[in-house]
Amino acid sequence: MAENDVDNELLDYEEDEVENAAGGDGSEAPPKKDVKGSYVSIHSSGFRDFLLKPELLRAIVDCGFEHPSEVQHECIPQAILGMDVLCQAKSGMGKTAVFVLATLQQLEPVTGQVSVLVMCHTRELAFQISKEYERFSKYMPSVKVAVFFGGLAVKKDEEVLKKNCPHIVVGTPGRILALARNKSLNLKHIKHFILDECDKMLEQLDMRRDVQEIFRMTPHEKQVMMFSATLSKEIRPVCRKFMQDPMEIFVDDETKLTLHGLQQYYVKLKDNEKNRKLFDLLDVLEFNQVVIFVKSVQRCIALAQLLVEQNFPAIAIHRGMPQEERLSRYQQFKDFQRRILVATNLFGRGMDIERVNIAFNYDMPEDSDTYLHRVARAGRFGTKGLAITFVSDENDAKILNDVQDRFEVNISELPDEIDISSYIEQTR
């Protein structure tokens, strides 16, 4: 039961197909407060060197980004020329900004035509990407962005496409395909086709079939870009079938997906000792925001309730709640209204909350990939962070060993005291 829960939460996909429903126009969401952040200064050359539109540079400055990350430095110059791109780079290094900036740079808005299609495997990630487009197109008032996903009435999406057709569409494959099949969404003018966390969509056969059908509805001549933090050697040939002579960028070798600045520890304990240990650690550790990962919806609800009873400012996100509630809670956490988030794997991939500096694996993830995506919620954008994993049985210990072997990282037992400066920025 718990395993199925985890799988469904991670993919969040079958709901797209069964509930004939979807998300609204991105413009209806509450305005997003600007959150300052800065990528690690790997390259002294700034974004200006990419010769981006002045409107884009202005938005980049507003976001507080000064220097491109390594993946941006490698990808953006080619991506803005319309080249196909296949990119793997570790979590938290700004892959989303690569395709957002590259497509906005090339976009020439035509009324009533969708030019850019971005797809990802969960609704929350789709919502977040649409917000990034809004953030970076702040000084491009003619650009319209919409997001479509399962969970709300399809009629609302059809109205948006009919009355206020966007130039950029972000969504999940199930809903995008439904809108394309009923002729509400016209894909004949697509110039840029993007898959974010592409491995998750192409590994699942039902989702891959949907992506392929959507792909065939778009023009032959277009730019295709695919991104992920984990891209196995088996899935790369599948990605290439969608592309023409792509530029391939693997910023890190598969075995070296370590996160610089992230301290990783484990705690050995019994399952019934987890709550007490968690409360003790939350009392002594310094944190901006914390994400606590659990394995099922039931545990998510119970732990969040327990934390609130212990006067910790916690909020829960899981697939058992209505779509509007999930997005509302995500936005509350992002806006710093709550400092502790309890979540299932649903929140594990690609979600950007820049203030998170501690991630807890209250329950051990089911594999090393999921471990990477979970702990990468802390220490994003090259900042410092702390990941603590609870190990309560032999299976947990085995997975932890797999993580250490695969990523060539040494995860040691949590010491009695940790130097605060090792996991929190002192000048935030």
UniProtKB/Swiss-Prot annotation:
GO terms for molecular function: ATP binding; ATP hydrolysis activity; mRNA binding; RNA helicase activity. Residues 1-19 have a biased composition (Acidic residues). The gene is DDX39B. SMART domains: DEXDc, HELICc. Disulfide bonds: none annotated. Residues 261-422 form the Helicase C-terminal domain. A motif (Q motif) lies at residues 45-73. Belongs to the DEAD box helicase family. DECD subfamily. Its EC number is 3.6.4.13. One of its GO terms (cellular component) is nuclear speck. Component of the transcription/export (TREX) complex at least composed of ALYREF/THOC4, DDX39B, SARNP/CIP29, CHTOP and the THO subcomplex. A motif (DECD box) lies at residues 196-199. One of its GO terms (biological process) is mRNA splicing, via spliceosome. ATP binds at A89, K90, S91, G92, M93, G94, K95, T96. Involved in nuclear export of spliced and unspliced mRNA. Component of the TREX complex which is thought to couple mRNA transcription, processing and nuclear export, and specifically associates with spliced mRNA and not with unspliced pre-mRNA. The TREX complex is recruited to spliced mRNAs by a transcription-independent mechanism, binds to mRNA upstream of the exon-junction complex (EJC) and is recruited in a splicing- and cap-dependent manner to a region near the 5' end of the mRNA where it functions in mRNA export to the cytoplasm via the TAP/NXF1 pathway. This is Spliceosome RNA helicase DDX39B.
